[in-house]
Regions:
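Structured helix-beta-strand junction loops
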Residues: 54-55, 142, 175, 203
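Histidine-acidic metal/acid-base catalytic patches
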Residues: 1-27, 96-97, 159-181, 185-266
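Active-site-proximal loop/turn and secondary-structure-junction residues that shape catalytic pockets
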Residues: 10-12, 35-37, 64-67, 103-107, ...
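Conserved beta-strand positions in the central sheet of alpha/beta enzyme cores
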Residues: 32, 60-62, 100, 147, ...
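Catalytic-core regions built around general acid/base machinery
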Residues: 44-55, 131-135, 139, 196, ...
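Glycine/Thr-rich phosphate-binding loops of Rossmann-like dinucleotide-binding domains
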Residues: 41, 109, 156, 217, ...
Length: 266
C-alpha cells in the first residue's frame, strides 16, 4: 500500500503538531511542506525541527513561489536557484527526501496570445539543463532529490509531459534529479497516463495527487484504479501527496482523501 501525505495548507490546525494530529486521524502517513521565497523556508527551521522531535513526518517540500529556475529574467532565475538550494538543504536537515518544483509556472503558454515565447526552444533547453544540473548537484551533496514537475500546457510552455522531463533528466545524468508527477497535469497532457507512468517509471521519484478538476481525489473523473495500478506495477514506493483544491466542507474533503485513495488501489 502506498503512503499518503497532505500538503500542510490543506490541514486544519495552527501548528504542524496540530495538523499532524488531524492527519493521522484521517489516515495520512505524512505532511508535505510548502516553501515560500525569500528564504522563508529556512527561517522555519526551528519550527520544523521541533515538529520532527514531536513525531511529525515531513518527507517532502513543494515550492510555493512566483518565479522558478526556468524564468526568462536572469535575476529571477538566479534567485529561484538560490531559493531551491536552500529548500533542498532544509529538507535534508530534517531528514526528508526531496523538494518538488516546476520549470516555470504562469510565465508563458503557447496556447494563449502571443503564442510564441520570447526565448527559443534551444535556449529554453540550455537554461533548464543548466538549472537542473546545478540543483541536482546540490541535492546530491545534501543526500536528497530534486523532483521536476511537468505542468499542463496552460501553465508552462517548456515541460508538460513525463517524456520531456525524462529526456532532460537523462541528459543531466544525475540520480538526484527525478520526475515529480502530478495526476492533474497528467490527465491533461498524457494520452494514456497509466502507460506514461510505466514508460518512465525509472525516472519517477515523487507523486502529487488531485482529481481531473483540481479538487481532492474522488471529486472528478480521473481513472484512479488505472493510475494507481500503474504506480504499483512500476514498483513506486514513494508518497502520494495531496496537492489540490477542496470542494464541499474543507475539513471533510481533506479527511476523505486517504480512504478514497486506499479504496481505489493505493
Amino acid at each position: 500500500m502506498l503512503k499518503i501525505a497532505a500538503q500542510e495548507q490543506l490541514l486544519p490546525g495552527e501548528s504542524l503538531q496540530h495538523k499532524w494530529e488531524f492527519a493521522q486521524g484521517a489516515g495520512y502517513d505524512a505532511i508535505e511542506l510548502r516553501a515560500k521565497g525569500d528564504l522563508h523556508f529556512a527561517s522555519r527551521l526551528p519550527e520544523l525541527k521541533q515538529a520532527l522531535k514531536d513525531g511529525v513526518v515531513m518527507p517532502t517540500v513543494c515550492v510555493d513561489m512566483l518565479h522558478f529556475f526556468g524564468a526568462f529574467d536572469d535575476g529571477l532565475r538566479r534567485d529561484a536557484i538560490v531559493q531551491m538550494k536552500s529548500q533542498l538543504s532544509v529538507i535534508a536537515e530534517i531528514g526528508g527526501l526531496g523538494a518538488q518544483t516546476p520549470a516555470s509556472y504562469g510565465m508563458f503558454s503557447r496556447r494563449l496570445p502571443p503564442f510564441e515565447p520570447p526565448r527559443s526552444e534551444e535556449r529554453d533547453r540550455e537554461i533548464l539543463l543548466e538549472g537542473l544540473t546545478e540543483l541536482g548537484e546540490h541535492a546530491s551533496a545534501e543526500g536528497v532529490t530534486l523532483y521536476l514537475e511537468p505542468l499542463n500546457r496552460y501553465e508552462d510552455h517548456m515541460v508538460n509531459r513525463l517524456e520531456q522531463a525524462a529526456e532532460l533528466i537523462k541528459e543531466v545524468g544525475l540520480d538526484s534529479v527525478r520526475i515529480g508527477i502530478d495526476s492533474y497535469h497528467m490527465n491533461i497532457e498524457e494520452s494514456d497516463p497509466a502507460q506514461a507512468i510505466l514508460t518512465h517509471a525509472p525516472y519517477i521519484g515523487h507523486a502529487q495527487v488531485s482529481d481531473s478538476n483540481r479538487f481532492q481525489p474522488g471529486a472528478g473523473h480521473l481513472d484512479w484504479q488505472a493510475w494507481l495500478g500503474a504506480l504499483h506495477i512500476a514498483g513506486y514506493e514513494g508518497y502520494l501527496a495531496a496537492e489540490c483544491r477542496l470542494t464541499g466542507d474543507p475539513v471533510e474533503a481533506v479527511r476523505s482523501v486517504p480512504a478514497f485513495l486506499k479504496g481505489s488501489g493505493a
